[in-house]
């Protein structure tokens, strides 16, 4: 047997252990050897000892992972704070990169959580069909409407006991069995076939809701069962627990209206009160203001509640405090009490981590352990490629018997004793061999046509685009009352939009995004696949006992090798549901009843599985200050937010004089104020939103709203020089009117800006344009997200017959769709009056519109710190002017106006590094260097 010391050195950093042959049964070893040529066992049966192979003195060193329990915890209203003592023993090195917080708690996603589209209850019912029900008229007379589906026993009458459903012959005499009113007749049972050819009159029974149960459409209706057979009737109030259940059920009998005497009921309805609920639907058409049962309320129409996925954010963004005053965290040696975590307001910890992951791997591959499922959107929703529908063939639906309505015929035959001299064949009744009741339909089978393709496309547009239009395009249905707070789920859910705003004929043939949708966050959508995945990881119920693992992201801590000593490690975890959780609708989860509580937060950590003498050698090396650990923040940037008031178009920015050495350039984008929390406070009471947070997770979508940016230093040097298409010191991003032909890619982006972006992201441009290599073209990069588009619209000026017909007066599909509402169709078939034809021989005069979208990325302007060499190029070259002097900076951004306050997020790409020194046991020191903003703030 091989001794452990004979194992090769590489086994130190691997799962080491005995060879399988040393501890498996001889028979299995023999089998493995015999089959090794075509079925290699490899290390499938390796001894699961995880440890160094020699010089091991304690079993503690052999453990792959250790659990640290907090020595102190503070559970406050808005946060949960944990304090650990990390004891790193001699000859060990703790790998902070392997640590994670193991968190258990309870999550209530609130009543606004709905993890599916449509309804789970009677989803096949027409939206406006009522349940079988009763109501009283103004004379207090009871009316009943609906279906009695269950046939009684043939030949047996309805008696006072109800509907006969069977005959018991076991005792020798036939005894009629009547329906058990507690659950029979069952709503799911009726005629098993369409065939009814025996000619006998059958009696029917059914169930109906009493008038005291308020009417709701069948679509979405649910009533809980009250007995194990599935009956749903409520118990009468007088019912006591000791007696047999007394259900609120009464029988109502009905006979044909034409009968005037000798009444004999044909129908019996078992009327009952039930606990009627609509868990996932709401009313969009309500004829009156009352909820009580009435004839008019038969016509109510339901719509499913909007889907609202709720889960933890990508990579648990927002759960741990970063970038916030006094709440950041502590990693301090107990000997020195110097905190290695320095608080800087304008760090980009979360965003930096997102971009780092993108550079390391494919973000479209989900990793459930760290909750890595990146926010995404369906590109077919953001930009609609409306190429019409392929509906060349008509689609029919047929009655169940394939015929339709029939007439009853009797048989006739040629008359044998025909009267002589009569022209034509004479006929006689044939009732000897032919039935007197023959059901025959003359002509083609009855059919109805439905354009399935067009309906699917129209439904897609309404569910995915129209319902996400800004609230100003929506209205509240008549007789429906919604909450005042527009951030609540009930308000967002109750608002409806005219389907004709986004119909199959809008922009038909074009690849175009609705202008109104361009500034709407496309990641706040039920087709956000990453959020949907993260929501479903937690399950499909409102209440979740969760158990999650959360890594540390702060760049100075996350990769640290912690040398022997005793350390204090403190961090805060948020309990603000709007920050910790993400919803696809972006509603205010605080108001809508979501809560989160933590029951335990433990820290799991790994020691490097090294032999003790190897670990001590590593420790000795790292104690030397020449081997200090240095970490660069991946983004290496100082982030500043500048407010842009509603409808403003110009934003001036001034940076005081400083030396711009080590400066790499600018990145910038635009954020909505509503979607950006105040990270400087532990709890932001004004953050009443739970959708994606571009500031933290990189879901930028307002880049297309920039027009120009000018950059001026306090010198006469033209920067970045006059060798570009446009004027120095100014970058024109898009131009609406392009007389010189400076635009590119069939959109309104300028060639100049396209060049700058290709150079900044891929160093492509001066050698000609080409598609960047795959490893450079990541999820957050420019080229992958650049979406140019164009369309033609009617030339309202030069087309003399143009009439500006507004939405209420436009008709298309009249008679086949609802009027300005997602309700029952109305109107008559008639020629459409909208839109004007842009093709064919009758095409009207048109103009071309162009635009682009570029989501997820940040605009970049690269910069060289010897920029002062970039003056006017002459025969003498470029003169060095102020190469190392300090300069003030003035920037002016020109943007499209938006009707809500926004923020300019300006990222100064700086040299951002931390150097961590651990000179003695239990001492940790950190120095943060940040140039040119060494103070950590771009305004100083």
From Swiss-Prot:
Protein family (similarity comment): Belongs to the adenoviridae hexon protein family.
Function: Major capsid protein that self-associates to form 240 hexon trimers, each in the shape of a hexagon, building most of the pseudo T=25 capsid. Assembled into trimeric units with the help of the chaperone shutoff protein. Transported by pre-protein VI to the nucleus where it associates with other structural proteins to form an empty capsid. Might be involved, through its interaction with host dyneins, in the intracellular microtubule-dependent transport of incoming viral capsid to the nucleus.
Residues with PTM Phosphotyrosine: 928
Cystines in this chain: none
Domain of life (superkingdom): Viruses
Residue numbers bearing the N-acetylalanine modification: 2
Protein name: Hexon protein
Site keyed Involved in interaction with pre-protein VI: positions: 765
UniProt main location, coarse: virion
Organism: Human adenovirus B serotype 16
Keywords of the record: Acetylation, Capsid protein, Cytoplasmic inwards viral transport, Host nucleus, Host-virus interaction, Late protein, Microtubular inwards viral transport, Phosphoprotein, T=25 icosahedral capsid protein, Virion, Virus entry into host cell
Upper classification of the organism: Viruses, Varidnaviria, Bamfordvirae, Preplasmiviricota, Tectiliviricetes
A biological process term (GO) from this entry: symbiont entry into host cell
GO cellular component, one term: host cell nucleus
HAMAP family: ADV_CAPSH
Localization, UniProt: Virion; Host nucleus
Gene field: L3
Extra facts: All late proteins expressed from the major late promoter are produced by alternative splicing and alternative polyadenylation of the same gene giving rise to non-overlapping ORFs. A leader sequence is present in the N-terminus of all these mRNAs and is recognized by the viral shutoff protein to provide expression although conventional translation via ribosome scanning from the cap has been shut off in the host cell.
GO molecular function ontology, one term from the record: structural molecule activity
Induction (UniProt): Expressed in the late phase of the viral replicative cycle.
Subunit structure: Homotrimer. Interacts with the capsid vertex protein; this interaction binds the peripentonal hexons to the neighboring penton base. Interacts with the hexon-linking protein; this interaction tethers the hexons surrounding the penton to those situated in the central plate of the facet. Interacts with the hexon-interlacing protein; this interaction lashes the hexons together. Interacts with host dyneins DYNC1LI1 and DYNC1I2; this interaction might be involved in intracellular microtubule-dependent transport of incoming viral capsid.
SUPFAM superfamilies, A to Z: Group II dsDNA viruses VP
Pfam families xrefs: Adeno_hexon (PF01065), Adeno_hexon_C (PF03678)
């Amino acid at each position: 047997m091989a001794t452990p010391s004979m194992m090769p050195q590489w086994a130190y950093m691997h799962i080491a252990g005995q060879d399988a042959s040393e501890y498996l049964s001889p028979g299995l070893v023999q089998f493995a050897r015999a089959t090794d040529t075509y079925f290699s066992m490899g290390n499938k049966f390796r001894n699961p000892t995880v440890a160094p192979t020699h010089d091991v003195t304690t079993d503690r060193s052999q453990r792959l992972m250790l659990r640290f329990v907090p020595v102190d915890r503070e559970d406050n209203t808005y946060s949960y704070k944990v304090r650990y003592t990390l004891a790193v023993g001699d000859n060990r090195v703790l790998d902070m990169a392997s640590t994670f917080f193991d968190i258990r708690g309870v999550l209530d996603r609130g009543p606004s959580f709905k993890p599916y589209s449509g309804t789970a209850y009677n989803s096949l019912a027409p939206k406006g069909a009522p349940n079988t029900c009763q109501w009283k008229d103004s004379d207090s007379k009871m009316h009943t409407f609906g279906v009695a589906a269950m046939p009684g026993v043939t030949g047996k009458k309805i008696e006072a006991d109800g509907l006969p459903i069977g005959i018991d012959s076991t005792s020798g005499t036939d005894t009629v069995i009547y329906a058990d009113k507690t659950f029979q007749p069952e709503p799911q049972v009726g005629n098993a076939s369409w065939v009814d050819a025996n000619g006998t009159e059958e009696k029917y029974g059914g169930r109906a809701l009493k008038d005291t149960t308020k009417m709701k459409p069948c679509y979405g209706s649910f009533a809980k069962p009250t007995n194990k057979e599935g009956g749903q009737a409520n118990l009468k109030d007088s019912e006591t627990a000791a007696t047999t259940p007394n259900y609120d059920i009464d029988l109502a009998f009905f006979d044909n209206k034409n009968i005037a005497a000798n009444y004999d009921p044909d129908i019996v309805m078992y009327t009952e009160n039930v606990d009627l609920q609509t868990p996932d639907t709401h009313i969009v058409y309500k004829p009156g203001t009352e909820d009580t049962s009435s004839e008019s309320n038969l016509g109510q129409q339901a719509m499913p509640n909007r889907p609202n996925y709720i889960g933890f954010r990508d990579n648990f963004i927002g759960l741990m405090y970063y970038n916030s005053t006094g709440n950041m965290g502590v990693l301090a040696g107990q000997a020195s009490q110097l905190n290695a975590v320095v608080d800087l307001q304008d760090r980009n910890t979360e965003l930096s981590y997102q971009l780092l992951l993108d550079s390391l791997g494919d973000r479209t591959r989900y990793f459930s352990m760290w909750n890595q499922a990146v926010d995404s959107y369906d590109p077919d929703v953001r930009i609609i490629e409306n190429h019409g529908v392929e509906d060349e063939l008509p689609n029919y639906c047929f009655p169940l018997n394939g015929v339709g309505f029939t007439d009853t015929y009797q048989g006739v035959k040629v008359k044998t004793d025909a009267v002589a001299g009569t022209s034509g064949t004479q006929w006689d009744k044939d009732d000897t061999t032919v039935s007197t009741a023959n059901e025959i339909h003359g002509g083609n089978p009855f059919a109805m046509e439905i354009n399935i393709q067009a309906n699917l496309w129209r439904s897609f547009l309404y569910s995915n685009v129209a319902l996400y239009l800004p609230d100003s395009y929506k209205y509240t249905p008549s007789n429906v009352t919604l909450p005042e707070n527009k951030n609540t789920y009930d308000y967002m859910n109750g608002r409806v939009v005219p389907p004709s705003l986004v119909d199959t004929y809008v922009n038909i043939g074009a690849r175009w995004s609705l202008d109104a949708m361009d500034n709407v966050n496309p990641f706040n959508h039920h087709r956000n696949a990453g959020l949907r995945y993260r929501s479903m990881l937690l399950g499909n119920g409102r209440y979740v006992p969760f158990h999650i693992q959360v890594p540390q992201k702060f760049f100075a801590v996350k990769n640290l090798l912690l040398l022997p000593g005793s350390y204090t490690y403190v961090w805060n975890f948020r309990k603000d549901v709007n920050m910790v959780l993400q919803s696809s609708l972006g509603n205010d989860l605080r108001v809508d009843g979501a809560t989160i509580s933590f029951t335990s937060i433990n820290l799991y950590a790994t020691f490097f599985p090294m032999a003790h003498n190897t670990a001590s050698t590593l420790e000795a090396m790292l104690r030397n200050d020449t081997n200090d650990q240095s970490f660069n923040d991946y983004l290496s940037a100082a982030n500043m937010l500048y407010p842009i008031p509603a409808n403003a178009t110009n934003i001036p920015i001034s940076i005081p004089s400083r030396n711009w050495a080590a400066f790499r350039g600018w990145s910038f984008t635009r954020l909505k104020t509503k979607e950006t929390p105040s990270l400087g406070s532990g709890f932001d009471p004004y953050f009443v939103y739970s959708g994606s947070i571009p500031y933290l997770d990189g879901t930028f979508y307002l880049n297309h709203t920039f027009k120009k940016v000018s950059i001026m230093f306090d010198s006469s040097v033209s920067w970045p020089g006059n060798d570009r298409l446009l004027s120095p010191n100014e970058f024109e991003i898009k131009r609406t009117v392009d007389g010189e032909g400076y635009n590119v890619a069939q959109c309104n982006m300028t060639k100049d800006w396209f060049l700058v972006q290709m150079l900044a992201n891929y160093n492509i441009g001066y050698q000609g344009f080409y598609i960047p290599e795959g490893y450079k073209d990541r999820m957050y990069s420019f080229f992958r997200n650049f979406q140019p588009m164009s369309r033609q619209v009617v030339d309202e000026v030069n087309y003399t017959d143009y009439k500006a017909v507004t939405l209420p007066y436009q008709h298309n599909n009249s008679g086949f769709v609802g009027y300005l509402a997602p309700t029952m169709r109305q109107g008559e078939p008639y020629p459409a009056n909208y839109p004007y034809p842009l093709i064919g021989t009758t095409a009207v005069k048109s103009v071309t519109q162009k635009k682009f979208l570029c989501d997820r990325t940040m605009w970049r302007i690269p910069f060289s710190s010897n920029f002062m060499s970039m003056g006017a190029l002459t025969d003498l070259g470029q003169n060095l002017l102020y190469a190392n002097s300090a300069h003030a900076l003035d920037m002016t951004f020109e943007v499209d106006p938006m009707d809500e306050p926004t923020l300019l997020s300006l990222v100064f790409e700086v040299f951002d590094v931390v150097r961590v020194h651990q000179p003695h046991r239990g001492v940790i020191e950190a120095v943060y260097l940040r140039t040119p903003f060494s103070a950590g703030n771009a305004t100083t």
